[in-house]
Structures are given as C-alpha cells and as structure tokens.
Amino acid sequence: MQQHLKYKIMTNIKHLAIIMDGNARWADQHNLTKSEGHKAGADKIRELLPEFLNLNIPYITLYTFSSENWQRSSTEVDFLIKLLSIYLKTELNNLHKNGVKIKVIGRLTLLSSSLQKQINNAIELTKNNNKITLCIAFSYGSRQEIVDACTKIITSGKKAVSDSDIQHALYDPEMPDVDLLIRPGGVYRISNFLLWQAAYAELYFSPKYWPDFNKYDIQEAINDYSKRKRTFGKR
C-alpha cells in the first residue's frame, strides 16, 4: 500500500528542487578536505540518478554553485568549476542514454569559454530527451536572474511589465514552478534559489548533509509533502 501510494504521490510533483548543502561540513566531520567533500556531493548525484528516474518527476533542479560562492577562496572556486567540467565529461553519456535532458542556468558568461562550450554541447546533445529534465544551477542567484530578466525586458522596449513577461525572460522560460524544495544540511533558508519559481513551493529541511542523503531520504521528503494541503493563498 505504501509503495503504491508513493508512486501515486510522485505523479503530482512536476518540479523538485534540491539545495545540495553540507558538503564542506561533511568533509570536516570526516577529516577530509573541502574538495573531497564537494566531490562526494557530486558523486551523490550519480548515486541518486536511478531514483530520480524512478520518481517520474519531469523536472529536477540542483543548486550546485551560487552567485555568492564566487566569494569563496580561489582554490575552492577553481575546484568547483573543475568538478562541473569533470561531471559533464564523465556522466554525459550515461545521462543521455537514460533519456535525461540537461539544462544549466546561471550567469554562465562568468565561466571560461571552454566550459561554456562544454555546457552548450551537453545541452545540444540531450535537447530531445524527454525522460526527465535535470537542470544544474551554476553561478546562479535568483535575484540576479530576476534583474537579468528585467534588463532584458527593458532592452526590448516594453513600458509595462507583466508576470508573463518576466517568466519568459528568465534563464529557462520553460521551467515549471517548484512544487517541493529540499534542503539537506541542517540550515533553514533558501539562499537566493529560485525565488520566482518557488513562490508557492513546499519546503523540506533535513539535518543530514548532502553526501549522506540517500533515496530513502528523498522518499521521506516526498511522503511528507504528500501530507500537506497546498492552498496557493486560497481557502
């Protein structure tokens, strides 16, 4: 009964967003370097991919590198950028084989031209896949996204701006509103992540660090979500 209910619930979630938090603290806990913690966090994506595919949730967004993360040490920033490149290189074929469409959102012009090309190649290769969309938020900040959207609208010559105008000017206009936002790591905030898209999202926080997160934790979050009544401001 519980298994049947679980998969019934899953069909109601169109967009799952995850803040992959706690990699550095996990590393400290295990006497490892921050780089080893971030690598463990990236490896967790690979581990959870089968579960993401089984969930049958059309759109999943992972917060991997925020606009504020640029302020960290150059060593840590360089490693995180390198990690994205390595992930795309080693995982792209498997993602493509499993029908995953890749999207990457953020201020990508801050990245090297070679990494931008690698990102564009991954997007182009998988653009016709339709099993799930895996969106990687990298060099991403939601306030910056909204500012960039407004700048785009102003540049187009519009004098009045609607919700629809902003939606169509976002980094990914096709991104559905977030239904469930999960944040591991024991921190209770959303950290400038998908503020526009998560306006009515249900929030789920876990004390577990991201590298310790597993498919049962994902399922627990979804089951918790299923017990909530979403009113969207109505009664």
UniProtKB/Swiss-Prot annotation:
Tell me which domain of life the UniProt entry assigns to the organism this sequence originates from: Bacteria
Tell me how the cofactor is bound.
Binds 2 magnesium ions per subunit.
**Which Pfam families does this chain map to?**
Prenyltransf (PF01255)
Q: Which InterPro entries match?
A: UPP_synth-like (IPR001441), UPP_synth-like_CS (IPR018520), UPP_synth-like_sf (IPR036424)
Q: What is its EC number?
A: 2.5.1.-
Q: Name one GO biological process term.
A: polyprenol biosynthetic process
Where Mg(2+) is bound, by residue?
D21, E202
Give the cofactors, semicolon-separated.
Answer: Mg(2+)
What function is annotated for this protein? Catalyzes the condensation of isopentenyl diphosphate (IPP) with allylic pyrophosphates generating different type of terpenoids.
Q: Tell me the subunit arrangement.
A: Homodimer.
Entry-linked PANTHER family: DEHYDRODOLICHYL DIPHOSPHATE SYNTHASE 2, DEHYDRODOLICHYL DIPHOSPHATE SYNTHASE FAMILY MEMBER
Name the UniProt record assigns to this protein: Isoprenyl transferase
Q: Which gene encodes it?
A: uppS
